[in-house]
Amino acid sequence: MHNELAHLSAYLPAIAASSPIVEGKIGPYIDNRLNFYKLCYKEVPSIVGDIIPEYVSSFEQYKKEVIGGYSIDLAKKGAAKELLDKEWMNSRGLMFRFCRSALELRILDEQECIKSDVAFSCFIRAVLRGLLSKKCEPVSHSILVSDLNSIIQNGLNATVNHPQGETARQVCLYFFKLAYENATKSEKKYLWIIKKRIEEGSISELIRGRVLNKAKTSSFKEAILSVYSPLIECLSENKPYF
């Protein structure tokens, strides 16, 4: 399941990006959060790796190559022994949490409302069922990393190298079809949110476009306040932002 989720995780930011504004200005990326996320670990890059986790075939391989890898680098930097060989030091977009018998997904930048959080959970579970049942040839890790970097920059319109599409939007529509085919009845009630997000744009893309449009007739600060006010209401009223 880890490897299938690693595959999917490269494309989730295209739908979930929510951080278009940086210090009161339109940021250079669709997903500015993930760009800064990479930069936070420049002193010990192996802690975050390529954000997309490496494929592994066993827990032993994961512990040796991933946890062991960044622990060696931390030791070279003089880190205290209490920080070495700890799973919680791993900051990839997906990681094992052995203490919880779980996989933790950090790559999402979803900041909308609880209903949308549930929609993403339903979508991810259903896609995983489909990927596990299809047992497809995995997309290479290098392609996933390249596609993620393109998505961080350009969102759903990013050019990608996935076998199911030339753009992130096309790949996400493929995943949506797979999700719908494998979703439970209760999960399907939430999937319309994901479908509409893929069709109309991530929160970041919507906010970016609306702020730039408002800024044509008002100050940039006023434009930001005008656009973000309805988003605040979405959180308090538990409704998706479209």
What do the PLM-derived regions correspond to, one by one?
Residues 7, 14, 18-242:
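C-terminal accessory/tail domains of diverse enzymes
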